Curated annotation (Swiss-Prot):
InterPro entries in the cross-refs: SHIPPO-rpt
Keyword Nucleus set for record: yes
Principal location: cytoplasm
Protein family (similarity comment): Belongs to the STPG1 family.
Protein name: O(6)-methylguanine-induced apoptosis 2
Origin: domain of life: Eukaryota
Native species: Bos taurus
Cellular location(s): Cytoplasm; Nucleus
Keyword Cytoplasm: yes
Length: 335
């Protein structure tokens, strides 16, 4: 009795443990089978078959329903560093590198919240609320103020330009011409609307003339005292005038004294001579044989009566004729 009761109690404890404790599956892309029964029975594929040739792609996945199970989305892949026994720790290439892969990067600088900025370094004016600092004046530069007045902020006085006393040195010959603005009378005539009296020089013409008129005479030709064109020959020799020699002792002659030769006529001026064409008429170049024939060309023979003239008839060459039947159904041989 005691043994049976102890077995029952012991067996009851075992049953109670299995009944009260619920197995929790691994929450990943491929959830394991849970202890709670449900409608669909999934197929369990071992993990060794899913890993093939260092690939992390999903293989041998069989989906039974359209409803995603727990852990079906937000998949977290495994680490690229494999700890499998089948893979070499030194790599799979020909010359593996001994350097460690995927080292943890440790920053050499402190984090943003690891230090505090002193208050004296913080700018009193925050430019981030308005515009960028590159479009504003620098805060550390002092703006220079102009101490001189503007062009319209003072009245110029003429007292500094005038002479203050008579003690200072002055020039010996001081000009008495007044300086300043030239007052133009409004009633005077405009330039060119009055005549200048030039009666002292010459009589002024009654036309509109300029106020500043030149007194140089225009249109006057000076009489030349030298010879004109063609009056002398620059290539000739100067002429020596021959005087008539009258003998002092006259001799009894039966003839008069010889007279000198008449002078040569002057050279002709422009337009007094005719231009002679010494080149002759222009030659007409015609083709001729080396031995020119004396036979007459274009000789028209005597016309014979009854002969037709040129272009009175039109000779025609007989064409090829066929052996087909004509209108008379006769054979026509080829000539």
């Amino acid at each position: 009795m005691d043994n049976s009761t102890q077995k029952d109690q012991h067996s009851g404890k075992k049953y109670s443990r299995k009944a009260n404790k619920v197995q929790k599956g691994f929450t990943a892309a491929y959830p394991t089978q849970s202890s709670i029964p449900y409608k669909y029975q999934p197929l369990i594929i071992p993990e060794s078959e899913k890993k093939g040739f260092n690939s992390q792609a999903k293989r041998f996945y069989h989906k039974q329903d359209d409803i995603p199970g727990p852990g079906f989305y937000n998949v977290i892949h495994q680490s690229p560093v494999f700890d499998s026994v089948s893979l070499s720790k030194k790599g799979t290439c020909t010359f593996p590198s001994m350097c460690a892969r995927l080292d943890t990067i440790v920053s050499k600088f402190p984090a943003a919240n690891a230090y505090t900025i002193p208050s004296r370094l913080v700018s009193k004016k925050d430019f981030s609320n308005s515009c960028s600092s590159m479009f504003q004046l620098p805060s550390y530069e002092k703006v220079l103020k102009f101490e001189t007045p503007a062009p319209n902020q003072y009245n110029a006085s003429d007292s500094c330009c005038k002479q203050a006393n008579n003690v200072c040195a002055r020039a010996g010959f001081v000009s008495k011409t007044q300086r300043g603005l030239f007052t133009v009378s409004k009633t005077g005539p405009a330039p060119g609307h009055y005549d200048v009296n030039e009666s002292l020089v010459k009589q002024s013409p009654k036309i509109l003339m300029s106020c500043f008129k030149s007194k140089t005479d225009r249109g006057l030709k000076l009489t030349s005292t030298g010879p004109g064109p063609g009056y002398y020959n620059p290539n000739g020799h100067p002429k020596v005038q021959k005087k008539t020699l009258i003998p002092r002792n006259p001799i009894l002659n039966f003839s008069a004294q010889p007279l000198p030769l008449p002078p040569k006529p002057p050279l002709p001026g422009p337009g007094q001579y005719e231009i002679v064409d010494y080149t002759g008429p222009r030659k007409h170049f015609i083709s001729s044989a080396s031995f020119v024939s004396n036979t007459r060309r274009w000789t028209a023979g005597p016309s014979q009566p009854g002969m037709p003239g040129p272009a009175t008839y039109r000779p025609e060459f007989p064409g090829k004729q066929s052996f087909l039947y004509n209108e008379d159904n006769k054979w026509i041989p080829v000539l």
